[in-house]
Design a protein with these regions (language model features):
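Structural alpha-beta junctions
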Residues: 191, 213-219
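Acidic beta-strand-to-loop metal/phosphate-binding motif
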Residues: 190-200
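Nucleic-acid enzyme cleavage-core boundary/entry regions
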Residues: 1-170, 175-188, 202, 208-212, ...
Length: 287
């Protein structure tokens, strides 16, 4: 920043203002594509590209704000942006799905119909959603999990028993635009959404924000204080992370947050896999 200031004071001031605007938008937790964000703020879609002064200052500011180390290489750079709601490109924004039918003006999307027939999981990117007008689940309920390993375990355990009733999504941590768009299509179609995530400060925060976004169409699944006790780990959670739990609005998550602040420990989906699996098996059997 000092180097840029030495070159041109006015441009340096504009640089700081633009990065500040990007950080302010990130706080709204609405994911955007990097080029779109850059063009909207500066008029140049490459303004925040890796290697530019603005791009470097943005990364430094994110790391300072999130108390993280600077990324080493392109892979860590992409991960950092994705975790803070900025997709480097339309393909990076994605959601993993099982048993989900996508609808277009021409009818059901043939590629995703093939995955459903084969009982295989697939990936939907933001690019794939161009031209998609709706989404159809196998039953009246859609189950959503936070972590990939949990998603894969459940699909592998249940795909042979499933006769087309089960629809399962994985948002992979902070939900990308692709995931939010698919969830919006499902709630618009009247489907009930059950969401389960890690019971650490970040996971509970994700669940609470999804609940606030989708209202009564989304229910919190297996994240109660009892589930927290069943899934508790030995991992200690620092005071800074625990402070994120002070503003939960969902009543179930608020009670779980109280328990977490008392114990100072995180609980994970992997520790309640049997409960999740049993819930899905009961759902399939009931259809």
């Amino acid at each position: 920043m000092i180097r840029e200031y030495g070159k041109d004071r006015e441009k340096a001031a504009q640089l700081v203002e633009n990065v500040g605007e990007a950080l302010a938008r990130m706080k709204q937790r609405e994911e955007t594509v990097l080029a779109v964000l850059a063009a909207d703020i500066s008029g140049n879609p490459h303004y925040f590209d890796r290697g530019t002064a603005a791009g470097q200052l943005l990364v430094n500011a994110i790391c300072c704000q999130e108390d993280r180390e600077l990324p080493k290489g392109a892979h860590e750079w992409r991960d950092l942006l994705l975790q803070t709601g900025i997709a480097p490109d339309p393909i990076s924004s994605s959601v993993h799905v099982y048993g989900l039918h996508l609808l277009t003006a021409q009818g059901e999307h043939p590629a995703y119909e093939a995955f459903c027939r084969r009982k295989e999981a697939s990936v939907i990117t933001l690019e794939n959603l161009k031209g998609v007008t709706g989404a159809r689940a196998g039953g009246d309920t859609v189950f959503v999990v936070e972590n990939e390993m949990v998603f894969c375990f459940l699909v592998n355990a249940l795909s042979e028993k499933d006769e087309g009733e089960l629809t399962l999504l994985c948002i992979s941590g902070q939900p990308r635009t692709a995931a939010l768009k698919v969830l919006s299509l499902l709630t618009e179609g009247g489907y009930r959404i059950l969401y389960n995530g890690d019971m650490d400060p970040e996971g509970v925060d994700i669940a609470d924000r999804l609940w606030k976004r989708f209202g009564q169409m989304l229910e919190i699944w297996r994240m109660s204080p009892e589930d927290y006790r069943n899934g508790i780990s030995g991992e200690q959670v620092g005071a800074k992370r625990l402070s994120r739990l002070c503003h939960m609005e969902n009543s179930i998550l608020r009670e779980t947050a109280v328990q977490m602040r008392k114990t100072g420990r995180a609980a994970y989906q992997e520790n309640i896999l049997k409960d999740l699996l049993e819930d899905l098996a009961v759902y399939i059997k009931s259809k």
